[in-house]
């Protein structure tokens, strides 16, 4: 059996790097802690960390370090505001934001030009609240017709219609 010759310094450095990566992904860092340990952190992991409450000030301070795609995927509903989306609208990955549960009807209205509509109509967490004829009428010019019938939104609307029909049958 071949022995691997690892010097202590290399092993310690590898362990340190991996441990910091793990901590980066789940520790609820404050702004001060992010600043203090900025050079040790794995910023892709930090960006995907759902235990960090990102303020506009924090995003501004760390915007060059943040992995915006990872943050767009992991953004929490309680963390999202129109101000936050507006301030960094050119940084967000809008396809990921459109597939995120953080979007409210008000945010959809405000950022309709940035939304990836194919992703939105397949967003499991949004479709139940969006599955209305009013929504379809309002955004008919934005919803991609070629993707609509195969979307989660379509299935949600058909399920609602099925329930209406069954209820109607039972009342007769």
Model-derived regions: residue spans:
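Alpha-helical scaffold segments
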Residues: 1-172
């Amino acid at each position: 059996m071949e022995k691997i010759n690892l010097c202590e310094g290399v092993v310690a450095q590898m362990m340190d790097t991996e441990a910091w990566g793990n901590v980066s992904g789940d520790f609820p860092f404050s702004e001060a802690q992010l600043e203090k340990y900025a050079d040790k952190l794995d910023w892709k992991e930090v960006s995907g960390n759902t235990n960090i409450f990102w303020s506009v000030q924090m995003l501004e301070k760390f915007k060059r370090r943040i992995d915006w795609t990872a943050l767009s995927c992991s953004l929490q509903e309680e963390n999202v505001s129109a101000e936050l989306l507006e301030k960094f609208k050119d940084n967000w990955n809008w396809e990921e934001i459109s597939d995120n549960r953080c979007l409210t009807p008000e945010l959809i209205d405000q950022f309709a030009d940035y939304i990836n509509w194919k992703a939105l109509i397949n967003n499991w967490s949004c479709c139940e609240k969006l599955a209305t004829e009013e929504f379809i009428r309002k955004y008919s010019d934005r919803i991609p017709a070629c993707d609509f019938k195969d979307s989660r939104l379509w299935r949600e609307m058909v399920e609602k219609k099925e329930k209406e029909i069954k209820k109607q049958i039972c009342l007769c």
